[in-house]
Regions:
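Amphipathic alpha-helical polymerization modules
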Residues: 1-261
């Protein structure tokens, strides 16, 4: 029964983790360019394999039950979501799965800056005229420098080539970076941005799909995400119920069946 408690407890832990992941996805179904996280599950080996006991105390029957489950590393779904028209001249939606906008993120505690990537293409000028995301991160040009918009040159807009147009002239270029195998080289890092797991492996994209006056919608589907969360909740509750049943059986085995008359 103790072994059964261990198996059920592992199921509770894994499914509550999945609940947290799906809850975060559900909270971001309206976030521009959001990419959903996908929890992973891996089989845990039986106790006799994971922690071999001396003198051959393995139990063949228990080994057949397995060792429960572990939470595996989470992955991110980078599939491009449908674009949505906004009519805003500085909005831009990327349509390729592996392209991103480069932004400069400043640590508020240390002042250190880091280049990160985002799919959120809702841009606007800040008080200094620099092009920023809705979270205040500086949008970078192909030279990794911030883009400044001169208000004296007229209204600015982004064209399909990622150029900032004022009047009839291109005054700047938005950096569009391509990342090979983004699922393994990028990790979510808050504020709808992605950081590199290791080396900065982005490449300047020379050809890419970009829709002006659009934004990419969230990659999290409200219906499917809600169904996933419900399934994880049911699985967690089922394992918790098994823990209660086994606890009751242990109580009776010790206090009732094991009572000495």
């Amino acid at each position: 029964m103790y072994y059964g408690l261990s198996l059920s407890a592992s199921g509770v832990l894994v499914n509550t983790t999945s609940q947290d992941v799906y809850a975060n996805n559900l909270a971001n179904v309206e976030t521009i360019g959001f990419k959903p996280m996908m929890p992973g599950v891996q089989q845990r080996p039986p106790e006799s394999q994971e922690d071999p006991a001396p003198f051959g105390t393995a139990n063949e029957l228990l080994d057949k039950l397995g060792g429960g489950v572990f939470s595996a590393p989470m992955t991110t779904g980078f599939k491009a979501a449908p674009p949505e028209s906004t009519g805003r001249p500085l909005d831009a939606a990327l349509t390729d799965n592996d392209t991103f906008f480069a932004v400069r993120v400043t640590d508020p505690n240390t002042g250190d800056t880091t280049t990160k990537l985002t799919r959120s293409g809702r841009f606007l000028p800040n008080s200094q005229g620099q092009l920023v995301t809705t979270t205040g991160h500086l949008v970078l040009n192909p030279s990794d420098q911030p883009i400044t918009i001169d208000p004296h040159l007229g209204n600015a807009r982004i064209d399909a080539a990622g150029r900032i147009i004022q009047g009839q002239e291109a005054v700047a270029q938005v950096q569009v970076a391509r990342v090979p195998d983004a699922a393994t080289t990028l990790r979510p890092d808050g504020d709808n941005t992605f950081a590199f797991r290791g080396q900065d492996n982005r490449q300047q994209a020379t050809a890419f799909g970009l829709l002006p006056k659009h934004v990419e919608t969230s990659g999290a589907s409200p219906i499917s995400t809600l169904n996933q969360m419900i399934a994880a909740t049911k699985a967690a509750n089922g394992n918790a119920s098994m823990i209660r049943y086994q606890d009751t059986m242990m109580d009776r085995a010790i206090n009732t069946l094991g009572r000495v008359a």
